[in-house]
Structures are given as C-alpha cells and as structure tokens.
Amino acid sequence: MLSNYVVKEILNDNKLKREYEFTIDNKYFFSQLDAKLLEIAKNVKIPGFRAGKASIDLIKKEYLNNAVNTLIRKIVEDTSSEFIKNGKFGEIISSNVSIISCPDYGMDVSSTSGDPVGDNLVYKLSFEVMPEAPLIALDDIVLSDIEADIQDSDISEFIENLKKQCSEFVEVSDSEYRVKIGDKVIVDYQNRIKGKMLKGGDTKDLAVIVGRGLVLKDFEDQLIGMKIGESKSFPIQFPDNYGVAYLVGKSADVSVTVKNIFMMKAVEENENVIKYYQFKDEQALKDFARNKIKQQFDKISFAIVKKELFDYLDKTYSIDVPECVVTQEINKINQEIQDSAGTVQVDVKAEAMKRVKLGILLVKMSRHHNISINKDDVFSFINTYYSDYGINLNDVLRMLQSNKDFANYISGKVLEDKVINYIIRLVKKDKKVMTTQELNLMLENM
C-alpha cells in the first residue's frame, strides 16, 4: 500500500511528539470506492429488485455517503498502521487523526461526515512515543535500612487500645447523670417542618452514641447534658450533603425525650482482654501486640525508604515525559486533592511530571529484570493495605473482577511495590535503629 499514499512530516520536536500529513492517491481511493459500491450492490436488498440486480446509480443514491465514510475510516486505519509499523517508532502512547480534506465524488461528503470537500483524501496523524529510559544504576544507590526498637511502652499502649475496643456499655442508674460524649443514649424523637410531621419523623427507641457522627451534629450536640426522662425541643437545619434530597437546606423542629443512658465501662485488667480475644495467656497477648506493632512499623519504614528512593531517582535522572500521560496524572492528583478536602498542598504539574518519570523508570526496570506480578502478589497487597481499614477483602476482590480501572490501578501499585522491593534488596544499606515515636515523627515530616 506504500505506493498509494504520500507522507509529509509536519512536526518532530526531537522529543516525543510527532505529526505527519498523509495524502491518499485519488486513483486508489476511487478504485476502492467503486469496489465497495459493487460489493454493496451484490449483497443489498432493495424493494422492487432481486438481490444484486439494483443499478449502480440507485446504489450510489442510497449508499454512497455511507460507503465513502466507511472507506475513509478503513484507509486511514490501514495507512497509519502500516506507516507506524514500518517507521519503528517504538511504543506509541496516544494517537489522534484529523481529516483535512476529502475527495469530491459528486456529493457533499461534509454533510454527513463533517469533513471539508477537497481534491484528495488528506489527513493528519499526531502521536506521542514512549521515551527511551535509562536503566537505574543500583550500585550508586544507598537507602536506609530501618530496624524497629519496640519498647515496653509501645506494647502497653497497644494493649490499652485493645481494652477500649472490648469495652462495654453499662446502664446508668443515677437519675442526675447527664449525657456526655461517648455515651449511648436511647431516645424518642419527632421531626416537623412548619408543624407537619415528616415521613419517618416519629421514631421510638433510637440508639445514639454521642460523638460518633452517625446522626446530625446539631442533634447530637443537643443531647449532651440531658438527663433520663428529660424532654426538649430545638431547631435543626439539614446540611447541603444530607442524603434525602428534598430536605437539603431546610429547617425542622425536633422534639426529643431521653429514655435511657448507657456509659462506656472501660476494661481495666489485661485478663479481661485475654478472655475477650481468647489469648492463651498474657505472654501471647504481648507477642500479638509486638507482632502488630512490627507490621505497622514495617509499613511506615517502607513508605519512608520508598520516598528516599523516589527523591533520589527524581534528582538523578532526567527524562522527557509524554504530555498526554502527564495530563492524565494531573487529573488524578486534582481528584486526590478534592477527596482530601484541600488538606493536600502540592505543585500539581511538577508532581504529575515526577510521577510519570518515576513510573517510566520503574517499568524499564521491571522489563529489564523480568519482574512480573501474579495473583498471590495482588492478594498480599490487598491484605496489607486494605485490612487495616475494616474493608471486607472479598468486596475488594469482587471489585477487581468487575471494575477494569480499579484492577489496572491495583496491578500498577503491586508492580511498583515489587520493583521497589527488588531495588531495596540489591542496593547498599545505611543501618538505622529507630523507636516507633522517631519513625512516626519522620513520617509526619515527609
């Protein structure tokens, strides 16, 4: 097909962007169009004619526009694919085609395709190529090797937190006791707007743990200081993010009666924790605490060493990064900032370029050293990074199967961590022993 089109280079910035203008030979175009129309004529059924017996003029009248548009798509696909294959451009990240002009075959092609009419089929092909990345020189890298200094105070603090988790609510018998944050309160309440009871607004025996944020904050705040048997009325306003659309922004009058109060009774002795969690003895409890602290320590130290490595790679290596990938990363970072309610402060473009550059370096490393991931790697990653947040692992696994974007995201993260661990294993180490407090302080200052 090379003899049927001419290619002119219109952009080569000596980096990653390429643009070429393709002009398709008219004789070739029209011969292909005639062949397409004959193919249609042989197979199409037109009322009043037997299959294949309709005149070519009738076929043109009915099917010319469709035939031209189909042919243009095929020629563009065939010529651009052939050119890219023969051009040996390497890995192409994104491409775009724009039609400059189309042949005039006695009809207004622009009326159906939106493309201008001209003497030849001319189109522009634009694309970006993946840059050639250097291989990371492992001999030049020195990273921290952080060893945990877990102290008795760390274990005691961990066990104290376990005690809070196995605490229980006990009924308050003092009639003068007033509701405090953390108490569980049993209430009856009614909601009215302009005197009219809301649907579902008359509720009995609602249990509210004050301070948990499971009901409106204005409602919780009004419960603080109330006694058993006390009733009160107060206004509330439904917030903009309230789950019931027709109530958003509206004010309501609430009447509430406290029927019972339960206060949290903390577990005081280790024996209670041992019994609650079914540990063999106190030493088993302490071993469990030490192991959990070590796991958290290792996660934090990995994050710190990972940042050390990324900072080194960013400073040491310079790569031209594809603009289209940077744009995608900018969108991701902006979404992260939005999700964090503005608590993340970062130079978005610089961070996006850094992430793309590091990704290219790590992909080069994975390919050179044949590093790949399997199902066990994915499951281990999910278990490590999701189990601490109370997320059901089966839900995550189902999402992996049903959501392609999520699956690609997880696969990318798993490969990234596997390459990083490979690098950490082979580079020089600077041994450091740190307490959990020192490690957490370092994490805060990252």
Swiss-Prot record:
Principal location class: cytoplasm
GO molecular function: peptidyl-prolyl cis-trans isomerase activity
PROSITE patterns named in the record: FKBP_PPIASE (PS50059)
Catalytic activity: [protein]-peptidylproline (omega=180) = [protein]-peptidylproline (omega=0)
Xref: Pfam families: FKBP_C (PF00254), Trigger_C (PF05698), Trigger_N (PF05697)
Class in the EC hierarchy, top level: isomerase
Keywords for this protein: Cell cycle, Cell division, Chaperone, Cytoplasm, Isomerase, Rotamase
Domain PPIase FKBP-type: 182-267
EC number from the UniProt entry: 5.2.1.8
Xref: InterPro entries: PPIase_dom_sf, PPIase_FKBP_dom, Trig_fac, Trigger_fac_C, Trigger_fac_C_sf, Trigger_fac_ribosome-bd_bac, Trigger_fac_ribosome-bd_sf, Trigger_fact/SurA_dom_sf
GO cellular component: cytoplasm
Domain of life: Bacteria
Any GO BP annotation: protein transport
Transmembrane segments: none
Localisation: Cytoplasm
Free-text domain note: Consists of 3 domains; the N-terminus binds the ribosome, the middle domain has PPIase activity, while the C-terminus has intrinsic chaperone activity on its own.
Job of this protein: Involved in protein export. Acts as a chaperone by maintaining the newly synthesized protein in an open conformation. Functions as a peptidyl-prolyl cis-trans isomerase.
The family this protein is said to belong to: Belongs to the FKBP-type PPIase family. Tig subfamily.
Protein name: Trigger factor
Organism, scientific name: Ehrlichia ruminantium (strain Welgevonden)
Organism lineage string: Bacteria, Pseudomonadati, Pseudomonadota, Alphaproteobacteria, Rickettsiales
